[in-house]
A protein has these predicted regions:
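Short, conserved charged micro-motifs
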Residues: 42-46
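Conserved aromatic-histidine-acidic binding/catalytic patches
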Residues: 32-33, 87
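A short secondary-structure junction signal
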Residues: 108-115
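Aromatic- and glycine-enriched beta-alpha-beta binding-site module
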Residues: 104, 116-118
Length: 174
């Protein structure tokens, strides 16, 4: 689909580390991680439903209301892989590939400060909801996932949250 639609995509996170440093997969990282620039991500989300072969399912908060994450997963519905953190949810639990949007970090210093302030504000607000030993972005994602599960009104603002959280951390994208 990426090739057919001429979409730009990247291998990221543990998948990129495994490919570069280990020449394959990292044993403790059991999924594949792909990221697309926001515009390409939106095209993929829009087109995937009618282009995916039988048995594959694009999972996100638009396709399954109970899905607790702010990115998408491409699931194989003919398989089962239970993630401990979401095992009780009534959602598709097939083997998956994580698909993340990448948002451009603003070039304007004022916009950068506002974005960083918004990230900090969200982090502080969410840290009150649930204390954790995790820090930084991992903690923020954990808190958002819990909010999605327990507090349905967060879905109303998910696009804004996605854009704040998927901007590169202090790096401007080209």
């Amino acid at each position: 689909i990426f090739s057919d639609l001429k979409l730009t995509y990247y291998l990221v996170c543990g998948s990129a580390l495994g490919a570069i440093k280990y020449g394959g997969f990292i044993p403790w990282d059991d999924d594949m991680d792909i990221a697309l620039p926001r515009d390409d991500y939106e095209i993929f989300i829009k087109e995937a439903g009618c282009r995916l072969p039988d048995g594959l399912f694009l999972q996100n908060h638009h396709t399954e209301a109970s899905f607790p994450q702010i990115f998408s997963k491409l699931r194989n519905s003919r398989t089962t892989y239970i993630e401990k953190s979401i095992s009780a949810l009534p959602i598709n639990h097939g083997v998956y590939i994580d698909i993340f949007p990448l948002d451009e970090y603003p070039a304007d210093r004022g916009a950068q400060r506002r974005l960083e302030f918004e990230k900090q504000r969200l982090f502080l607000k969410l840290s009150v909801v649930y204390c954790s030993k995790k820090t930084g972005r991992a903690a923020l994602y954990q808190h958002l996932n819990r909010l999605f599960h327990y507090d349905r009104h967060v879905h109303e603002n998910v696009e804004r949250l996605e854009r704040v959280l998927t901007c590169s951390n202090g790096q401007r994208s080209d």
